[in-house]
Regions:
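A structural signal for multi-pass alpha-helical bundles of membrane permease subunits
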Residues: 1-222
Length: 222
């Protein structure tokens, strides 16, 4: 939804569209590990920018990722990771939706304007249905991307996926567990576990792809 709103806003201001498009796309071509480390610094308990802003408005500092003074909750860590993922994935989604918007025939909007249709109704009745191929594609690829997430955890939480104060990798993802088993799993069967997990992940992605094909035929409007 956020990427759609930004794409619509960019499409409505053609004068600065190229400049803004470049600015929004920069995070996508930046090294993900480097961005994650920047986020880890921003959400640092003692000297992070986010806690500094919270304290400026009279609030108490939050243990986002944990520190020597306290342990962060799972949901605080998850919030930081989600903010990073959204910020990092947003440029690609905006670019796809913006290209879709520019391919929509302007006659639809002209007819809606003559009929006195509101902007909200135009968005929900014209723009969204005609962008359904791009929207469905982004939804499915985002779902698949969630299974493959690895860089964000390593960059923000660390290679052990264990926040400060915890004894177990509560932030471990599917790919993280596969990688840990490849490095050396329990009982010397790490490579076997990783191979089985990779096969299972492949099957899940194939099922999602099949569902995508089914949904596209039923709900996508060209």
């Amino acid at each position: 939804i956020l990427s759609l709103l930004i794409a619509v806003a960019l499409n409505s201001i053609p004068k600065f569209q190229k400049v803004l498009q470049t600015i929004f796309f920069l995070p996508y071509v930046t090294n993900t590990i480097a961005i994650g480390m920047v986020f880890a610094v921003m959400f640092d308990t003692n000297s992070g920018l986010i806690n500094t802003l919270i304290e400026m408005f009279g609030g108490d500092p939050v243990e986002w990722l944990g520190s020597a003074a306290g342990t962060a909750s799972y949901w605080h860590c998850m919030f930081v990771v989600l903010v990073y993922i959204i910020w990092n994935a947003l440029p690609f989604k905006i670019l796809i939706l913006l290209s879709g918007l520019q391919s929509i025939d302007k006659q639809y909007y002209q007819a809606a304007q003559i009929d006195g249709t509101s902007k909200f109704r135009t968005l929900t009745r014209i723009t969204a249905p005609l962008l359904s191929p791009q929207i469905i594609y982004l939804m499915i690829t985002s779902f698949i991307g969630a299974f493959k997430e690895y860089n964000s955890i390593v960059a923000i939480i660390g290679p052990t996926a264990t926040p400060y104060g915890y004894q177990s990798p509560i932030m471990g993802t599917v790919v993280w567990y596969l990688y840990q088993n490849i490095k050396g799993g329990k009982d010397g069967f790490g490579m076997g576990y990783a191979a089985a997990g990779s096969l299972l992940l492949f099957i899940i992605i194939m099922i999602i792809t099949a569902i995508n094909s089914r949904i596209s035929k039923k709900f996508v409007h060209y």
